[in-house]
């Protein structure tokens, strides 16, 4: 990635956090830092935990994984539930290892949980989630404690549904659980936090080219191999590109249409990521990329 000149000082052993939008070059930067300063690369991307997705999730290649240790990549079966809470429980023991953790990904909530703490909320029972999946957004909002609802983005169904599920399953409002948040496993002050500040047009061009690169690396074959087990409700099948290629494999759309839909979905996701990073990562070191 060749951004070494822009890096801040990286003290011996200090954990490094790397956040950035999809297709911005985070994995390349993590590998560069691991090779220059030492460390183990730890995944903080929700789609890259599944063993069935390498090309479609842009998981590091076997050749890249051979250049430095990688953890929490492709270690779960397709039907495993996964959330920020699952990730936090997996990553916390790794902070006490002998190797410097280089934690890299685009899932902003993971970094917030790591550096600010996260309430230990019980897992949502499947029947409660199934009920929530059937309810329209306004019904979900109506069933949430007003104090919790006041702090939510009411247009973000995933956040609204999560708040509804917690209250329905536990009988306790989400904001009360959050008030009991324990200390963070890794306070930001103990880390070297880096966020990639990307030029929008540069990123859009990379996104446009990325889908074809995924196809060249076998993304269509990956999705075809999972077609018989496809369940759009499972987190693994919500990875961008999977629903679009499934629709193509079912004969519903052309490959060109799948490419266009996936590119649009990726741009929309990148826009949400960039907004999150600007709003929530003001104390992180900015690394300009592209442009």
UniProtKB/Swiss-Prot annotation:
Reactions that this protein is recorded to catalyse: adenosine(37) in tRNA + dimethylallyl diphosphate = N(6)-dimethylallyladenosine(37) in tRNA + diphosphate
Gene3D superfamilies attached to this UniProt entry: 1.10.20.140, P-loop containing nucleotide triphosphate hydrolases
GO BP of this protein: tRNA modification
Site (Interaction with substrate tRNA) location in chain: 107, 129
Swiss-Prot/TrEMBL keywords: ATP-binding, Magnesium, Nucleotide-binding, Transferase, tRNA processing
Main EC class the enzyme belongs to: transferase
Sites where the protein binds substrate: 22-27
Assembly information from the UniProt record: Monomer.
Record-given protein name: tRNA dimethylallyltransferase
Species per Swiss-Prot/TrEMBL record: Ruegeria pomeroyi (strain ATCC 700808 / DSM 15171 / DSS-3) (Silicibacter pomeroyi)
Gene: miaA
